[in-house]
């Protein structure tokens, strides 16, 4: 056996447990012999004390007799050298085998709840003072249900409603509806900022035991139950889903086709409005309750025959909630203005039978109600919304269209003439 050079220098930290030989020491040979509690010998720097300290660390029993992971922090932890503390007490308190296993968790739970409520109050203060978008949902904990009382409305949806009311010359109703939503948002924020006992209990119940939300289709919204219904944006809901106001329901949009509708990609309306199928002209309230009931026909983004809607007839707020399957059609106001279109984003011909086949209207809602038009005539519609004639353009706009690049600040807002397009 090799002689321990560290022992000769008086600084071997393993003592009797050393694998090398300690000449002149009792129990030389280290690890092959049992460690002695009080080894003797003429050691130069008192390695016996070091031996006792490190031997206790290396013993396997030291890991099992120390305080377990889940032990109470108030409990006195044994040191490395004292193993006479009750192991049974450690096992009970550490691994939760006592008579009341949740007794030691209640203080931590109270701290967590207090911290959660303080975080919610702080978030509400920041939300109110930062000027962030107010029509949004809120959840203080990741992968937990949203707190009730907030609606998720995108700026695009509000802008669409603005255009719908603008075409109907009823902007005051739009302003009243938006103001009502703002007031309800402020009231809910104030409730969460000044929490009372009942509000705290309801809030913690929403966070911990809230209804599990299904994964939304294509990232739109959730199936959370409605608790924040605005009278300014009513929902014509005849289904049993209890849809939230302004919510993108997961069972809409690209769901399976409903009975009486051979088209795919729809079973219920996208915004919770009732959908129906009729054989003649149908009238119904818009999906969000804006304006008056309108005479409906083919739906927006429709790539099927008029007997079936491809994207759901009440896909956006200003569009109707029912679907007309008969050949008789009545025009409604387009979503993006212009012409007497059949639906918000344009529609197909009254006798088109396949997707992308001979539409009778322009792409963005400028159409003439005709029974059959060729593809070329449908591109150059009577109203020419997609293209602007030369005589309606100013000299500056015409120069910009004829140049290779637009000049910053002088880009025309009108569509270009058809003659200048290279197709």
UniProtKB/Swiss-Prot annotation:
Ranges of biased composition (kind: Polar residues): 37-69
Key words, A-Z: Glycoprotein, Membrane, Metal-binding, mRNA transport, Nuclear pore complex, Nucleus, Phosphoprotein, Protein transport, Repeat, Translocation, Transport, Zinc, Zinc-finger
Keyword match Protein transport: yes
Protein location: Nucleus, Nuclear pore complex; Nucleus membrane
Annotated region described as Disordered, given as residue ranges: 24-110
Listed GO CC annotations: nuclear membrane; nuclear pore
UniProt keyword annotation of Zinc-finger present: yes
Domains: entry comment: The FG repeats are interaction sites for karyopherins (importins, exportins) and form probably an affinity gradient, guiding the transport proteins unidirectionally with their cargo through the NPC.
Subunit-level organization: Probable component of the nuclear pore complex (NPC). Interacts with nuclear export protein NXF1. Interacts with GLE1. Able to form a heterotrimer with NUP155 and GLE1 in vitro. Interacts with XPO1.
Function per UniProt: Required for the export of mRNAs containing poly(A) tails from the nucleus into the cytoplasm.
The name this protein goes by in its record: Nucleoporin NUP42
Organism phylogeny: Eukaryota, Metazoa, Chordata, Craniata, Vertebrata
Gene giving rise to this polypeptide: NUP42
């Amino acid at each position: 056996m090799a002689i321990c050079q560290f022992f000769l220098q008086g600084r071997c930290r393993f003592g009797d447990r050393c694998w090398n030989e300690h000449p002149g020491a009792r129990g030389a040979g280290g690890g092959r012999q049992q460690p002695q509690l009080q080894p003797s010998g003429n050691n130069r720097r008192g390695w016996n004390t070091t031996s006792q300290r490190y031997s206790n660390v290396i013993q396997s029993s030291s890991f099992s007799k120390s305080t377990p992971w889940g032990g109470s922090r108030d409990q006195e932890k044994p040191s490395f050298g004292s193993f006479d503390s009750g192991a049974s007490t450690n096992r009970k308190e550490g691994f939760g085998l006592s008579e009341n296993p949740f007794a030691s968790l209640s203080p931590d739970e109270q701290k967590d709840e207090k911290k959660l409520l303080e975080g919610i109050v702080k978030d509400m203060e920041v939300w109110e003072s930062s000027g962030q978008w107010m029509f949004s949902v809120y959840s203080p904990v990741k992968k937990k249900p949203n707190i009730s009382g907030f609606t998720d409305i995108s700026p695009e949806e509000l802008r669409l409603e603005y255009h719908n009311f603008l075409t109907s010359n009823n902007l005051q109703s739009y302003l009243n509806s938006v103001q009502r939503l703002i007031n309800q948002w402020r009231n809910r924020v104030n409730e969460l900022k000044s929490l009372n006992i009942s509000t705290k209990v309801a809030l913690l119940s929403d966070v911990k035991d809230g209804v599990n939300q299904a994964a939304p289709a294509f990232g739109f919204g959730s199936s959370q139950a409605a608790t924040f219904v605005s009278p300014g944006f009513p929902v014509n809901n005849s289904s049993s889903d209890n849809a939230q106001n302004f919510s993108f329901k997961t069972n809409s949009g690209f769901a399976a086709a409903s009975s009486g509708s051979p088209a795919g990609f729809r079973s219920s309306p996208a915004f919770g409005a009732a959908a129906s199928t009729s054989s003649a002209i149908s009238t119904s309230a818009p999906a969000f309750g804006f304006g008056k009931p309108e005479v409906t026909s083919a739906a927006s983004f429709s790539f099927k025959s008029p007997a079936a809607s491809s994207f759901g007839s009440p896909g956006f707020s200003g569009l109707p909630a029912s679907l007309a399957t008969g050949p008789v059609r009545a025009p409604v106001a387009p979503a993006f203005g212009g012409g007497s279109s059949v639906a918000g984003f344009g529609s197909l011909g009254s006798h088109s039978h396949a997707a992308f086949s001979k539409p009778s209207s322009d792409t963005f809602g400028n159409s003439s109600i005709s029974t059959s038009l060729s593809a070329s005539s449908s591109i150059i519609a009577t109203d020419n919304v997609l293209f602007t004639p030369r005589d309606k353009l100013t000299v500056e706009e015409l120069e910009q269209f004829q140049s290779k690049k637009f000049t910053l600040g002088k880009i025309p807002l009108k569509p270009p003439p058809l003659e200048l397009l290279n197709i």
